[in-house]
Amino acid sequence: MDGSNLPGARYTRGEKIKTRVMSGPNLALAATVAVLAALTAVALATMDYGKVSFFEALGEAGGDFLTMMTQPGLAGHFTLVDVVTGLFVSLALALLTTFIGAVIAFVLGLLAARNLTNGAVSTVIKAVMSVARAVPTILWVMVFSVAIGLGAEAAVTGLLFHSVAYLVKAYSESFEEADPGVLEALRASGASWWQVVFSGVVPEKVNEMLSWTFIRFEINFVNAVAVGAVAGAGVIGYQLFLAGSFYLNIHEIGLIVYLCLAVAVTLEVLATRLRKRYIVQK
């Protein structure tokens, strides 16, 4: 029976079936996953649980999670005003760090774009920003919490470092894709560097810049919630930390999680639409 006559067959007689050979990186990744899975299995099998039953504890954790998701509410440790205020403080913190970061990143992004500055300056700025991006936001916040103390200052400064590094990369790559013909025409007409920037680059790339900035705002909100327990800046993340680690109230945890999730999903939907409209389909 000829295989080419089978329904859905897309090959004819004489064609070779293409096979994909595992490359070195894929083999290394598969081996790493296999080793980690084996170590995890060994650890679970040999761990000393004492008098705690693993499966019983797992069942209780599942029950707590179900309670948290199905019975959110307040238990007297916080008022609804406190929780909503913490949510708006988180949004304000994200907005502040995004605005300041965008201003700084705009200048550094211009200096990092190879079509607007020399290669040495661009290389140095991009290298420094790469190092800053490699350090997790939570670690930056912890560093500044030790350096300048707990509070909004440490949270803003820590979030700012990663925001600047992220936006410099996004802005500089957008600037480098500006129409070279327009830039060359402006330079040939005697335009200054700033005139080239504001007449040839910014008008073309302003939509992309705003889209990247809003995407970073969405990321900063999530980070602001996460760093609340570290910085103690009055954000909703700190209330979540208290509800989970100090008051041990599952219902309050559920309410706070739902509020954070609602805002995060809304921002994510808006960011995705902006990304598709101004960045992917540019």
What is each PLM-predicted segment?
Residues 96-129:
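Transmembrane-helix boundary motif in ABC transporter permease subunits
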Residues 150-216, 223, 269-272:
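Membrane-cytosol interface at the C-terminal ends of specific transmembrane alpha-helices
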Residues 117-119, 134-140, 152, 208, ...:
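Transmembrane alpha-helices and adjacent helix-loop boundaries
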Residues 129-163:
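Generic hydrophobic transmembrane alpha-helix motif, especially the helices
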